[in-house]
Swiss-Prot record:
Binding, Mg(2+): E39
GO terms (BP aspect): deoxyribonucleoside triphosphate catabolic process; nucleoside triphosphate catabolic process; nucleotide metabolic process
UniProt keywords, alphabetically: Cytoplasm, Hydrolase, Magnesium, Manganese, Metal-binding, Nucleotide metabolism, Nucleotide-binding, Nucleus
Subcellular location: Cytoplasm; Nucleus
Protein known as: Inosine triphosphate pyrophosphatase
Catalytic activity field: ITP + H2O = IMP + diphosphate + H(+); dITP + H2O = dIMP + diphosphate + H(+); XTP + H2O = XMP + diphosphate + H(+)
Function, in words: Pyrophosphatase that hydrolyzes non-canonical purine nucleotides such as inosine triphosphate (ITP), deoxyinosine triphosphate (dITP) or xanthosine 5'-triphosphate (XTP) to their respective monophosphate derivatives. The enzyme does not distinguish between the deoxy- and ribose forms. Probably excludes non-canonical purines from RNA and DNA precursor pools, thus preventing their incorporation into RNA and DNA and avoiding chromosomal lesions.
Xref: InterPro entries: ITPase, ITPase-like_fam, RdgB/HAM1
Similarity annotation: Belongs to the HAM1 NTPase family.
Protein residues bound to ITP: 8-13, 51, 67-68, 84, 143-146, 167, 172-173
């Protein structure tokens, strides 16, 4: 049995991670803990690694951190890893307004997980991407920017209009977690 602490205070993220990793009897046990880690600026990769190093030292055990980005093609990748701040300050409508006057609403949802086997160990990265478009908000507004991201393979629906199981089959988080699951399964052999 492989186990790690997923460093998050977000119940929705924890629920998604557990649901995705539970599929197929992976033998991976996930607990969670909120750890105060500095809010850094940089790429999703830099942020995930830095958070993971701090968390591993504080927890003294194997842990996983996540950084998520929503990258607008028209804005050369912005808001990127700062999506949480953009969303808090301008909301779903403001994010759509940013794209007014641009010829494209294409965006990439990017999820980067960093896994550390413990303190002093260099974190390993696992990334997942989903391509889509930014659209006016539709569906439940419970989970971040899900109402405005319409994945290309989503049948014309936003993440927020999909049930959890359906979203978890195509999401950026799912794709990154599948890579993490494969790595942990290989290490357990």
């Amino acid at each position: 049995m492989t186990s790690f602490v997923f460093v998050t205070g977000n119940a929705n993220k924890l629920r998604e991670v557990k649901a995705i990793l539970a599929a197929g009897d992976s033998g991976i046990e996930v607990t969670s803990q909120s750890v105060d880690v500095p809010e850094l600026q940089g790429t999703t990769q830099e942020i995930a690694i830095a958070k993971c190093k701090v968390a591993a030292e504080k927890l003294g055990t194997a842990c996983v951190t996540e950084d998520t980005a929503l990258c607008f093609e028209a804005l050369n990748g912005l808001p990127g890893p700062y999506i949480k701040d953009f969303l808090a300050n301008i909301g779903h409508e403001g994010l759509n307004t940013l794209l007014n006057g641009f010829p494209t609403t294409r965006a990439t949802a990017l999820c980067t997980f960093a896994y550390s086997p413990g303190p002093g160990e260099e974190p390993i990265l696992f990334e997942g991407r989903t391509e889509g478009n930014i659209v006016p908000a539709r569906g439940s507004k419970v989970f971040g920017w899900d109402p405005i991201f319409q994945p290309l393979e989503g049948g014309g629906r936003t993440y927020a209009e999909m049930d959890g199981e359906e979203k978890n089959k195509i999401s950026h988080r799912y794709r990154a977690l599948e890579k993490l699951r494969a790595y942990l399964s290989e290490q357990a052999k």
